[in-house]
C-alpha cells in the first residue's frame, strides 16, 4: 500500500433540522393548539485513531466528507431524528491542523482516541416552543443552525522510540533488518528507502522498543533536496536518535565529512531537534582493518568534537548490535523512570517536543510555499528583494527616463 503521511480534507457537519409548524386537529377539539416538534441535531464529524492503519492514502483522492443533517420536526410534538455522526478512521500518530488558522486541533496518539473536528448544527424549534399566555396559536418556528465546516490538514508522524539518521547507504535499513523482524529493501545504490519503515526490537522476553528508518538525508536537504527532508518530521516524537555513519563508503568519501553534513542539515531543519538525545553509531566496521578502523573513529570524534555515546558496529554481520540494543533499552527505561519521578525533567522534555513540532511544521510549510510559488512561475519574497537591490544599484548607470502624460 502506498505510504501517504500528509493530506488536506474538507469536513462539514450536518445542519440542524428545521422546527415544525403544526396545530392539533381532532374531532370535537376546535382549538387544539400548537403541536409542532423541534428538528433533530445535525451529525458531527469525528476522527478516530485506528491501530490497523498506517497511511492516509484513503484521503488522497476522496477529500470531502459531510455528516448527515437532522430531520425536521413532526406534528404531535414529535422531534426530528438526529443526524448520524461521521467517524473517519486515521492512523495512530495523526496530528490534525486547521488549514485556515494553522492551529493544532489535536493529536491522536492512542488507539480508539476520538477527536471532534466539526460540531453538528443545533436543531430548530417548533411552534409549540413559542406558545404563551398571550399567544395561544403561534405561527413562529426557527430553522436549524448550519453545521460547522472546516478545511483540515492531517499529518501522520510514526510513533517510534528510536529514529535513525544518516546519509543514503549508511546502512540504516540493514541495521533495522539485523535487530528486528522488519524487512525493508536493501541495495547498493542511494535512496533505496523511499518511505519510513518501522521495526520492533525485542530485548529479553518482555521488553521491546520501536525503531523508525527514514530515507537518507543529503547535502541541501533543508532546502528541499532529496527525499529525507519530508520525513524528518517523523523523528519529532522519537525518544532517541541514532546517527549512523558509513565507515567505508563505496565512493571513498570522508566519514567525518558525512557526519558533519547530517548535523548541518539537522540544524537547519530544526535546531531543537539537535537537542534530542543522540548517539553516534559507526557502521560497516567489518570492511576495515583494526588500525584503519581506529584511525577513522578518531577522525570522526575529533571533527565533530563528540562527547556522547559512540558505538562501532557491523549491521550486516550483527557485530555490536546486541550490546547497542541492550543499552538503548536501558536508556528508555531510565528515561521513563525519570519522567515519572521528576516533574521538572518531564516538563523540559515536553517543552522540547513542542519546540521540535513547531519548528518542523514551520520549515515544511515554508518549503511548500516555495514549491507553490515555483509552480505558479513566481519568486519568493527574498528573491524579489534581491532583484530589487540589484536594480537599485544599476539605476545610476543607465539613462534617466521621464514619463510624460
Swiss-Prot record:
Keyword tags: Cytoplasm, GTP-binding, Hydrolase, Magnesium, Metal-binding, Nucleotide-binding
TM region(s), chain numbering: none
Bias type Polar residues, positions: 129-143
Pfam families with a match to the protein in the record: GTP1_OBG, MMR_HSR1
Record-listed E.C. numbers: 3.6.5.-
A Gene Ontology biological process term: ribosome biogenesis
EC primary class: hydrolase
Cofactor: Mg(2+)
Residues that, per the record, bind Mg(2+): 173, 193
PROSITE patterns per the UniProt record, alphabetical: G_OBG (PS51710), GTP1_OBG (PS00905), OBG (PS51883)
Family matches, as Gene3D superfamilies: GTP1/OBG domain, P-loop containing nucleotide triphosphate hydrolases
Residues bound to GTP: 166-173, 191-195, 213-216, 283-286, 314-316
Domain OBG-type G: 160-333
Domain named Obg: residues: 1-159
The keyword Ion transport appears for this protein: no
GO CC annotations on file: cytoplasm
Composition bias type Acidic residues, residue spans: 383-398
Compartments where located: Cytoplasm
Family to which the UniProt record says this protein belongs: Belongs to the TRAFAC class OBG-HflX-like GTPase superfamily. OBG GTPase family.
Function text: An essential GTPase which binds GTP, GDP and possibly (p)ppGpp with moderate affinity, with high nucleotide exchange rates and a fairly low GTP hydrolysis rate. Plays a role in control of the cell cycle, stress response, ribosome biogenesis and in those bacteria that undergo differentiation, in morphogenesis control.
Subunit record text: Monomer.
Name of this protein: GTPase Obg
Organism: Azotobacter vinelandii (strain DJ / ATCC BAA-1303)
Encoding gene, per UniProt annotation: obg
Amino acid at each position: 500500500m502506498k505510504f501517504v503521511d500528509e493530506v488536506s480534507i474538507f469536513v462539514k457537519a450536518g445542519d440542524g433540522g428545521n422546527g415544525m409548524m403544526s396545530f392539533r386537529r381532532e374531532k370535537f377539539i376546535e382549538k387544539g393548539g400548537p403541536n409542532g416538534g423541534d428538528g433533530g441535531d445535525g451529525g458531527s464529524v469525528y476522527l478516530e485513531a485506528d491501530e490497523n492503519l498506517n497511511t492516509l492514502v484513503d484521503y488522497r483522492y476522496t477529500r470531502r466528507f459531510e455528516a448527515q443533517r437532522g430531520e425536521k420536526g413532526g406534528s404531535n410534538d414529535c422531534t426530528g431524528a438526529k443526524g448520524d455522526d461521521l467517524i473517519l478512521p486515521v492512523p495512530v500518530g495523526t496530528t490534525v491542523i486547521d488549514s485556515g488558522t494553522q492551529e493544532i486541533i489535536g493529536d491522536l496518539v492512542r488507539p480508539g482516541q476520538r477527536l471532534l473536528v466539526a460540531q453538528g448544527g443545533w436543531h430548530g424549534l417548533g411552534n409549540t416552543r413559542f406558545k404563551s399566555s398571550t399567544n395561544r396559536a403561534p405561527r413562529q418556528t426557527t430553522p436549524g443552525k448550519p453545521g460547522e465546516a472546516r478545511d483540515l490538514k492531517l499529518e501522520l508522524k510514526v510513533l517510534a522510540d528510536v529514529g535513525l539518521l544518516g546519509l543514503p547507504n549508511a546502512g540504516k535499513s540493514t541495521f533495522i533488518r539485523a535487530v528486528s523482524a522488519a524487512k525493508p529493501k536493501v541495495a547498493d545504490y542511494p535512496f533505496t528507502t523511499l518511505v519510513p519503515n518501522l521495526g520492533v526490537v525485542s530485548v529479553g522476553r518482555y521488553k521491546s522498543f520501536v525503531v523508525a528508518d527514514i530515507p537518507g538525508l543529503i547535502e541541501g536537504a533543508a532546502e528541499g533536496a532529496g527525499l529525507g527532508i519530508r520525513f524528518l518530521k517523523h523523528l519529532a516524537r522519537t525518544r532517541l536518535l541514532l546517527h549512523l555513519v558509513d565507515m567505508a563508503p563505496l565512493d571513498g568519501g570522508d566519514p567525518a565529512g558525512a557526519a558533519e553534513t547530517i548535523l548541518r542539515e539537522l540544524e537547519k531543519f530544526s535546531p531543537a531537534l539537535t537537542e534530542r538525545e543522540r548517539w553516534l553509531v559507526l557502521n560497516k566496521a567489518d570492511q576495515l582493518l583494526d588500525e584503519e578502523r581506529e584511525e577513522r573513529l578518531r577522525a570522526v570524534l575529533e571533527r565533530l568534537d563528540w562527547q556522547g555515546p559512540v558505538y562501532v558496529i557491523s549491521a550486516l554481520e550483527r557485530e555490536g548490535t546486541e550490546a547497542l540494543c541492550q543499552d538503548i533499552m536501558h536508556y528508555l527505561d531510565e528515561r521513563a523512570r525519570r519522567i515519572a519521578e521528576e516533574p521538572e525533567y518531564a516538563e523540559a522534555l515536553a517543552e522540547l517536543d513542542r519546540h521540535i513540532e513547531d519548528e518542523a511544521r514551520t520549515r515544511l510549510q515554508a518549503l511548500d510555499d516555495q514549491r507553490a510559488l515555483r509552480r505558479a512561475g513566481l519568486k519568493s519574497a527574498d528573491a524579489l528583494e534581491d532583484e530589487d537591490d540589484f536594480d537599485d544599484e544599476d539605476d545610476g548607470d543607465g539613462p534617466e527616463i521621464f514619463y510624460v502624460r
